Amino acid sequence: MDKVGKMWNNLKYRCQNLFSHEGGSRNENVEMNPNRCPSVKEKSISLGEAAPQQESSPLRENVALQLGLSPSKTFSRRNQNCAAEIPQVVEISIEKDSDSGATPGTRLARRDSYSRHAPWGGKKKHSCSTKTQSSLDTEKKFGRTRSGLQRRERRYGVSSMQDMDSVSSRAVGSRSLRQRLQDTVGLCFPMRTYSKQSKPLFSNKRKIHLSELMLEKCPFPAGSDLAQKWHLIKQHTAPVSPHSTFFDTFDPSLVSTEDEEDRLRERRRLSIEEGVDPPPNAQIHTFEATAQVNPLYKLGPKLAPGMTEISGDGSAIPQTNCDSEEDSTTLCLQSRRQKQRQVSGDSHAHVSRQGAWKVHTQIDYIHCLVPDLLQITGNPCYWGVMDRYEAEALLEGKPEGTFLLRDSAQEDYLFSVSFRRYNRSLHARIEQWNHNFSFDAHDPCVFHSSTVTGLLEHYKDPSSCMFFEPLLTISLNRTFPFSLQYICRAVICRCTTYDGIDGLPLPSMLQDFLKEYHYKQKVRVRWLEREPVKAK
């Protein structure tokens, strides 16, 4: 009995040493009954109740199974073994202590020492009873637990139990639930991570206010990101007013090369709307118009360059009503047609309609003769007066690149080219702006020349033509000569100017004949007055 008492005291001492570092965080409930051996099912239930409260349940279950007696061994007789006085079952219900500072490595080390020095640790284990079905289930669970520990050991790359304890303590203590889920499924399905530091960057980002965009000068430091954005916004939201001085103060160095073409187009648009500077000693031809405008257009539509009559009764009448072939795509003719429809509607409406505006506009022009009229007349591809249908009949069945030069049927344009491309007969008018001829005067990036013949020479090279531009490689020569009157006009126009024709001792009818091939260049547009129409 003395030996049994010493062994019992030794067992209690070692059990206290095992769980004493947990303090009040663990609830030890040792239940001893030498006459009753509880089933393995009860022990598994007791351990299962504590498992949901712990992060590493396989490790805790393994500890509990190694601390207790083997569930497959029972002792029916008290005097068979010297350890018969020791309780066969130790039920331990462990509550997790969230504030515990002890590491799992300490518990596992003490467990190994306890198992090695236990009285039955070095003995050969015998059993007086057969294994029941419940004991088999417990062994299977124990095998699964060990296999789970091996998998975890292989996964974290540890080779010893203490290394595994350190890794598991880091995984359980310092990793959140989202991080553990990402470790589990992240290899197959990566989870998006959101940095908490990135959110304030967007919320604190500086924005350009509307009041800053209304300023004439950039309020931000030169070369900064906000300054570049300010200039970019101002460029794409340029005011429609012809008096805008935005491009005068614009710094081209702050604009990227991608926006250079847009900047040039906007400058050309303002130049077409405002006019160009007249050359020195040029005779200015002034056109004044007074128009009653529909209230839908607050400032009125733009007056077309072809409107040359002066009307004092509140409306402007176009000079002629020509039937052109491509007026639906002509900017100036669209404005003229809107004015025609508006005038026809105003003629039936009452003069004292509320909300209408009376606009006084003064447009200054200079008149210039075609500089190379003699070269054009001597060119065999020039056919003179011809409409599009006659040109299509001549070009029918011709090879790709065949073209001819003819007079344009539109009054605001002088010449047009008809050519074959893509197995069709196409037409392109030659536009003029600021004494330069091109196929698109509104786009400064399109090739332009100071003469019409120079423009034709450029587009004879197929490598210089874009897919949408005219291809003028083969000229279709005319089959008749011009009259002597046409040739003399070309020679006289080469030696004089438009205003110089008035000084020639010629009849007025002949002077008008000499002035036929000329163009008007807008040099100034002035809005004299905008006032509501007073009721009569």
Swiss-Prot record:
Residues 1-50 are annotated as: Required for interaction with IL4R. It comes from Mus musculus. Induction: By a subset of cytokines including IL6 and LIF. Interacts with EGFR. Interacts with ELOB and ELOC; mediates EGFR ubiquitination and degradation. Interacts with IL4R; inhibits IL4 signaling. Phosphorylated. Phosphorylation is induced by EGF. Residues 158-169 have a biased composition (Low complexity). Pathway: Protein modification; protein ubiquitination. Pfam families: SH2 (PF00017), SOCS (PF12610), SOCS_box (PF07525). Residues 22-59, 95-175 are annotated as: Disordered. Widely expressed. Expressed in TH1 but not TH2 cells. SOCS family proteins form part of a classical negative feedback system that regulates cytokine signal transduction. May be a substrate-recognition component of a SCF-like ECS (Elongin BC-CUL2/5-SOCS-box protein) E3 ubiquitin-protein ligase complex which mediates the ubiquitination and subsequent proteasomal degradation of target proteins. Inhibits for instance EGF signaling by mediating the degradation of the EGF receptor/EGFR. Involved in the regulation of T-helper cell differentiation by inhibiting of the IL4 signaling pathway which promotes differentiation into the Th2 phenotype. This is Suppressor of cytokine signaling 5. Keywords: Growth regulation, SH2 domain, Signal transduction inhibitor, Ubl conjugation pathway. InterPro entries: SH2, SH2_dom_sf, SOCS4/SOCS5_dom, SOCS5_SOCS, SOCS_box, SOCS_box-like_dom_sf.
